[in-house]
């Protein structure tokens, strides 16, 4: 299948809106609850669910094998599969085997991770761009036995111009997260029309008895902006050092969708209008997975109308 055909097939399978499986950061959930969550999200009308991983605690591709088997049509993507969790050749083989078993239901999103994750497996992080390039090239290396002959889209976590250029050169697209819609527009222009652009969007739903959604969003955005690379990416979208230091309203509104289901949908639509093929709200998940799923079920009528 030609690269453009892979992208077109992925666009058709994913649809414009998916969702991240709402497991609280740094935690896990019993696999039976995850099966139930995936089935409920499928019944709610979501066509795609994204998961992630760090290093240790779980294996995202094993997780997807369970969830693919538990659902009928749902597309699953890794957002992201961490390159320090498995060798490149193993990642290729595992993804190809899943794609062979479940055609058109897998998107492999890869990310370079962080130095501490490389150190956890006794590896040198190196220069991120060179490390990621080397990993992608090793995925294509021949093995004995060969990997399954199955086609699936590969996309690359990319929030900056250099990693975005690598995504355009060696993969089927990019997976940015936590940036404003103006950055989505720049990324679409840089990628061109023939690459897949999947955007993760932080989402904070107004809940009775909880702090206001915008204030929860402000706290999360402020914490995220402590990462220098994200602060620099935000500056490229025109925000000032003062706005970043203050975490002002305009910055919060640009970096997170918050409020009612209709307001969340409007925030997602901003990215679709800017050129995203697919958007995935990332809920500020609490510890109860199935309660978080209830929130996504309430969101479904508004966001799936996009």
Across the structure, where does each feature detected by a protein language model lie?
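Active-site-adjacent structural elements that line small-molecule/cofactor binding pockets in enzymes
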Residues: 1-306
